Each structure stands twice: as structure tokens, then as C-alpha cells.
Amino acid sequence: MENSLLRPYSIGIVLEDKEGDSDMIKVMPSEQLSMFSGNLNEQKLNYEVNVPDSQGIKRESHVEGGVELVAKWIFSSGNRVTAPNVKKNESVLIYRFADTDEFYWETFMREPSLRRREHVHYAFSNLPNGINSYDKNSSYWFEISTREKHVHLHTSKNDEEPFEYDLRINTREGNLVITDDINDNITIDSKNRIITINHASGNKIEINDNDITMTNVGGSVISMTGGDITINCSNLNFNVSNATITGSNIQLNGGSVTANGEDLNTDLT
């Protein structure tokens, strides 16, 4: 069996912070420089490159360049979509494809003293078959970004799921939102001390600091069931069209009890 044409080339030192979501870095192949001394910026490396011509015959060429290489992320981390946000002076492993000038890189050490803000995206295919590439609408994915200050988890519904869901944490603004695709959502607004539950029907429960508001639209039912229900408050006001209180024993206790109305009917048996 022939050996792979993609093979380890050198341990490298990252020369500049990787830009944004790019897969490319500028790197110095440190193991190739052990014979050099002096200013590295003035050093040159000679590369032997075998490139096929238009007839497929390999021609050997010699290329001279500086100690800086441009390498592409080798994408060896399973479901990770975005390249690691390597910083200047981090260590990476450089690969070279055959005798070409194609170089690739991957991380191989943990260097927490060098790594800073990151943006990481993982995706998991939700396509049942076929040869099409999956995307954000046909995969389950999550994103953690200390650079953009958010965490986002998403499920798609392309494979017969009835609904899709999103969970978003915005650490810059201080809120958490859970939503589905039919307009149900739960929001925790830590900054303003508000917790809100919104139903697709328009019904709503909101806890705003010390105030609790329940909104029922469309004349539906609000039902409370329990062994004992106790309400302790300074004032209790009912504004209703019709009110019915039913029980085997009903007691009204107070310094004074007042009933006002056009008609007051009492049936004591």
C-alpha cells in the first residue's frame, strides 16, 4: 500500500492572529528553521515542487520563499465547521501535500495562556439520504461565541420533525430566549428583570420585577386547581360580568362586608 501524499511537514508557530472565520493562517515551520540564525525575516527557504504539466508529466521546480507559509485548516475535528481561532505564537501541526506548495494545519496542543476570544460552530446533518450538502436549515447545530457574546442551539425540521426550536443566550445584552417556529417563546431578560411566556394564541404571562401580569385573549379559560389555594394581599379586586362562588361552606370575615348592586338575592335555607 502506498503512503498518503498528505504527510506531516513541521511543527509551526502562528505568526498572526487568524482572521475572523477564515480557514487560513500565516505560520512559521519551526522545525525547518533549526539551521538558520539571525533575523528570520531575512531568511529564505527552498522548496522542491513537482507539478504536472498540461500533458500530465511531472516537472520539478525549485521555489524560494520566506519562512512564512500560508496554510489552510485541515478540518480534522469531526462536526466542527469553523477553524480554531488560533492566536499569534500558538503551536500548530503543519501538513504538506506531496511535493506541492499546498500546506494545511491543525491544532495539537492546549495553550490557554495564548488562546483568547473564540467563535465555534458545530453542525450535525439532518439529511436522511442523497448527495446534497446540508446547511443550517437541514442540520442540528450549535454555536458558542465569546467573540460575539452568544450561545445558539438550533434544530431543523427538514426530516419530518413537526417543529423546529431555537435556544439563544445573549450574554452581551443579558437575556435568554427559547422559541419554536409557531411563535411560542419564553424570554428571560435578566437586565430588566423580566420573565415572559408568550403563547402563539396571544396569551401571555409576564413577571416584571415585582409585578405579575396574566393576559388571556379570545375568551379562553384560566383554571387553577389545588388542595389549598391561598391569596394574601392588601387589596383584591374583581371586575367581571358574572361571578359564581360555589362551595359547601363559604365564609366572609371582615370588620365590614359591603355588597352593592341593583339586585341582591339571598336564599338561606
Per-region residue spans from a language model:
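Hydrophobic packing positions characteristic
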Residues: M1-G227, N232
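Long terminal segments
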Residues: N232-T269
